[in-house]
């Protein structure tokens, strides 16, 4: 803390949702977290074995065996119709670079954001050069954490208390801005307890009910995982 995704895309219409290219350990973790959050997910991989293993997580998941370096194959699968693509494969390096380039620059692509996995600083720079909007290192970020960030962009950090409960630090959602804690009554409406609120590096712990939340400020809340995930993300 700060001080603590058979595809049925509609032709001609860009869609929300996520595509995950490469479903090894990292990609599968991303898919699992997205599915758990109820997100629309399309998974593709060169390997039938990888796709079969992914279906053990959720037999209903939309997953296809696709040449991930072939523009027309990715287009036919529906990957280029989704807003966010996670290029989760890292080897061979040329494959991840090619997939990233296709998603960003292919004619008619509707992809708005590509998050690519890198294995080295050089790999990172090459991915950025072909248009990756964000590059992550598996050694520094778990797939599950990336999945959570994708569906809850205002989640900054989470602390596990036990299997059922935790503490999260989030950016104040727009729907909370300008409202007091008394008005929001998060304990009643969301079953969470507010531990702290305020500006970055200037949090007020156990804030009074009169505290009015501002744009860009932070909120630290405690509750069950189910309750925390029900908080608005935007």
Where are the regions that the model predicts?
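Cytosolic regulatory regions of ion transport systems
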Residues: 1-234
């Amino acid at each position: 803390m700060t001080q603590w995704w058979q595809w049925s895309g509609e032709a001609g219409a860009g869609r929300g949702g996520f595509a995950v290219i490469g479903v090894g350990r990292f990609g599968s973790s991303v898919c699992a977290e997205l599915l758990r959050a109820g997100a629309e997910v399309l998974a593709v991989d060169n390997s039938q074995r990888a796709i079969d293993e992914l279906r053990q997580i959720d037999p209903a998941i939309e997953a296809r065996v696709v040449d991930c370096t072939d523009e027309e194959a990715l287009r036919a699968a529906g990957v280029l119709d989704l807003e966010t693509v996670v290029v989760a494969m890292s080897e061979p390096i040329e494959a991840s670079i090619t997939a990233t380039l296709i998603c960003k620059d292919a004619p008619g692509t509707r992809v708005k954001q590509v998050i690519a996995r890198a294995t080295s600083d050089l790999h990172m720079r090459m991915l950025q050069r072909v248009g990756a909007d964000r590059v992550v290192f598996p050694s520094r970020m778990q797939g599950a954490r990336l999945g959570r960030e994708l569906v809850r962009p205002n989640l900054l950090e989470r602390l596990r208390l036990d299997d059922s409960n935790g503490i999260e630090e989030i950016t104040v959602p727009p729907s909370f801005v300008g409202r007091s804690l008394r008005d929001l009554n998060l304990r009643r409406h969301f079953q969470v307890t507010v531990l702290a609120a305020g500006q970055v590096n200037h949090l007020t712990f156990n804030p009074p009910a009169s505290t009015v939340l501002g744009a860009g400020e932070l909120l630290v809340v405690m509750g069950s995982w189910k309750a925390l995930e029900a908080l608005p993300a935007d």
